Amino acid sequence: MFDGADTVVLYEELAFQTVLPVQWRPTPNPTSDIAAAFSDRNVRLLQAWDAMEEHGPTEKTDENSPAAADLMRLELKINLLLDLVGQLFAANRPRPTAVPVRFNALGVVWRNASGPLPEAGAQGVAEIYLHDALAEPLRLPGRVTNVTPDGNIKVRFLPLGEAVADLIEKLAFRRHRRQIAGARQPRRT
């Protein structure tokens, strides 16, 4: 039975944890206006990322039907196309090193892989590259609340706007639900 011991939490809220490229861009006094300016783009990025996440079939399809085979081939071609586009983006736009990151609508924590560490209290924008096929990063303005000597950086976001916050919370919840379902699956030996 799932006991919640592996639940990923940040600022006392369910969080999303994975390995992604992340960087910090210092900016003087980010305001709610900056978060609003990033909002539409962040919503589109989160919606695209959600569409790319593998959710699996909602209903068991008839694998013998010709339509199922066509859909599977189409899905494989789209995945191949996304991989190729991602490789082109990666070749033309270098990204930061992928690091373990945990984030939700309230903040983010990651280990800095290179470069100088920001100071606690520094203001700026956390940039999280969600997928190789997405050209732009998620841009989340906030303030550094803690920096550890080994390079862990914790940022509290400015209010991101309802649409962005809802999408981040939804994605964190889905990931958490899949982890619970995976923990409940009997292991095959």
Model-derived features: where do they sit?
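Structured alpha-helical
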Residues: 1-189
